[in-house]
Design a protein with these regions (language model features):
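Short glycine/threonine-rich loop-to-helix capping motif typified by GTGT followed
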Residues: 259-276, 296-309
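Short Gly/Thr/Asp-enriched flexible loops that form oxyanion-binding sites at enzyme active sites
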Residues: 111-124, 266-272
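N-terminal, Lys/Arg-enriched amphipathic/low-complexity engagement segments
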Residues: 2-42, 52-56, 60-64
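Mixed-charge interfacial surface used for oligomerization/domain docking
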Residues: 164-269
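Glycine-rich oxoanion-binding loops at beta->alpha junctions
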Residues: 57, 64-66, 70-96
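Conserved small/polar residues in nucleotide/adenosyl-binding loops
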Residues: 335-336
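Short alpha-helices
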Residues: 128-181
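C-terminal edge-of-domain segments
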Residues: 290-322
Length: 337
């Protein structure tokens, strides 16, 4: 195992410390229990959005705390769900009187612990469950489809609505619409190593790829030989299109996400291939996102997410955002403490 580590037991704390120092103009990190919140308290009467999950997927979720997205994020240990007391403490810290909306990826541990945290919290709250992965219906960590990269899109789009006065009910309704109209497929060329384990999550040959891999290294649809990028991308899109069934000329957002170990040069190549394929099918790409947003430590691979867009979705996607990992449409001054 080759990683920047001092002591495995201190890995998460040191990482969170560094994150807090690097982005002290936007966020603050709270310990015991661990959660990340906005530096400036949410304005009164705004719905507060809280997400979280196991660490190792950065910048999801802590990198999306800030104006136009999340109010707080709860990081668990690497690939492990956060504990209910984290969600309770985060909610108590950021609730501004309009209620709390928890955004939860569909993994058994996450759902159980977020549900317990919501029950422990005495304030008004509700939840969205994301399950955009079209690869498999059931997996090692889930009953039903896994929640993966489209969670980022939910957090951005719902975050805008919440920032602009949407009610708890309206925010949940929009989040469910985004989730329902999203589909994701991932491919891995390599495994990844959880620091506490010290060895790869799974074994894979140098000439093999896992088609439909999960963000914790869960098995996908099949293991096969690596093929040319256009073939891989076409197969990924076929799976997504079979699920979403977009209409010809329907507006979409195309999101190419890196798993952590794949360079941007390759991600843009994937995006180019995807654009050509979707154009040939008469599908309009009106918005795009390319980069490492929902990762799996150092895994080499990528996922493709397609989101069918209406005017409400596009309006909230385009709205200003300022977080550690996603920012546009705002002029800000920086003050590091």
């Amino acid at each position: 195992m080759k990683k920047f580590i001092n002591n495995v037991d201190d890995f998460l704390k040191e990482s969170l410390n560094g994150f807090g120092k690097a982005h002290s103009d936007i966020i603050k990190v709270n310990f015991e229990p661990n959660f990340i919140s906005r530096k400036t308290k949410t304005k009164d009467g705004k719905v507060s959005l809280i997400s979280g999950g196991g660490s190792g997927h950065e910048p999801m979720h802590g990198g999306f705390v800030g104006h136009g997205m999340l109010d707080a994020a709860c990081p668990g240990f690497v690939f492990s769900a956060p504990t209910p007391d984290q969600m309770q403490a985060a909610a108590e810290n950021v609730d501004s009187g309009a209620g709390v909306l928890f955004i939860v990826k569909n993994y058994s541990g996450d759902i159980m612990n977020f549900q317990m945290g919501a029950e422990m919290y005495s304030g008004k709250n509700d939840s969205i469950i994301t399950n955009d992965d079209v690869a498999v219906e059931d997996s090692t960590f889930t009953t039903g489809r896994r929640g993966v990269a489209a969670t980022v899109l939910v957090e951005k789009i719902v975050g805008s609505l919440a920032e602009n006065g949407g009610s708890l009910e309206e925010c949940k309704k929009l989040g469910e619409k985004v989730n329902k109209n999203s589909g994701t497929m991932g491919v891995a060329f390599t495994s990844c190593t959880v620091p506490a384990a010290g060895k790869p999550t799974f074994d894979i040959g140098n000439d093999e790829m896992e088609f439909g891999v999960g963000i914790h290294g869960e098995p996908g649809r099949k293991r096969e030989k690596i093929q040319p990028s256009k073939t891989i991308v076409n197969n990924m899109l076929e799976a997504i299109l079979d699920d979403l069934k977009p209409q010809k000329n329907e507006k979409t957002l195309l999101f190419v996400n890196g798993m952590g170990g794949t360079p941007l040069t390759e991600l843009y190549l994937v995006y180019d291939n995807a654009c050509e394929i979707l154009k040939s099918k008469g599908i309009e790409i009106t918005r795009s996102l390319v980069g490492n947003y929902c990762t799996s430590l150092e895994m080499q691979g990528a996922s493709i997410t397609l989101l069918k867009c209406d005017e409400e979705i596009l309006k909230n996607w385009d709205a200003p955002v300022h977080t550690a990992a996603m920012r546009w449409g705002m002029s800000v001054s920086y003050t590091h403490l």
